[in-house]
Amino acid sequence: MAHPSQLGFQDAASPVMEELLHFHDHALMIVFLISTLVLYIIVAMVSTKLTNKYILDSQEIEIIWTVLPAVILILIALPSLRILYLMDEINDPHLTIKAMGHQWYWSYEYTDYEDLGFDSYMIPTQDLAPGQFRLLEADHRMVVPVESPIRILISAEDVLHSWAVPALGIKMDAVPGRLNQTAFITSRPGVFYGQCSEICGANHSFMPIVVEAVPLEHFESWSSLMLEDA
């Protein structure tokens, strides 16, 4: 869960998000070293009265500032490509959920069940219970079993939306007429919040996403109750 004045990412709740955090730290270290080196060179050039007679024509310097940036880009690109392939992998999902974006709410359908689906609307501020979060709570949460591979199919009924949950490392466009898919595994129980991340009209800010990860036996009890109420 994000908090005021937060400078970093939310705590990772999926293996993909953990990889993204590691990659962020890796890239940030490289950027810090480059910035330090450039700042040192600028200060050294400005503060000295000496002049290097080879500064305008030096094959060694030409080779260094050609090869070194290429090596740095490779060190950034290889981990990035690994994570991209990891995010695209969908292996034997235990559960498939279809999320549809509407103006301005989400609807969910558990396709492995015959009649398990619901609409998810934001809870108005005046109806919030103590301890609930303004603009982030939904009347129906998307409940998933913890530590289980989940495939989610994402589309939209009207305009372009985007289904995003930062703690899970997920952001996928919901495009009318097109079915996108991604997968995730929740690494711990909890409630994870997200929002529509594509401007989609007047009430774009009022499309929260709430994913609740629970133990498998709790999920089975929840799904049974939902099917009875259907």
Curated annotation (Swiss-Prot):
One of the protein's GO biological processes: ATP synthesis coupled electron transport
Subunit structure: Component of the cytochrome c oxidase (complex IV, CIV), a multisubunit enzyme composed of 14 subunits. The complex is composed of a catalytic core of 3 subunits MT-CO1, MT-CO2 and MT-CO3, encoded in the mitochondrial DNA, and 11 supernumerary subunits COX4I, COX5A, COX5B, COX6A, COX6B, COX6C, COX7A, COX7B, COX7C, COX8 and NDUFA4, which are encoded in the nuclear genome.
Pfam families in alphabetical order: COX2 (PF00116), COX2_TM (PF02790)
Mitochondrial matrix side: 46-59
Recorded GO CC terms: mitochondrial inner membrane; respiratory chain complex IV
Record organism: Gadus morhua
Gene designation: mt-co2
Signal peptide: none
Name of the molecule in the record: Cytochrome c oxidase subunit 2
Residues that bind Cu cation A1: 161, 196, 200, 207
Amino-acid positions noted as binding Mg(2+) in the UniProt annotation, renumbered to this chain: 198
Catalytic reaction equation(s): 4 Fe(II)-[cytochrome c] + O2 + 8 H(+)(in) = 4 Fe(III)-[cytochrome c] + 2 H2O + 4 H(+)(out)
Membrane topology listed for this record: Multi-pass membrane protein
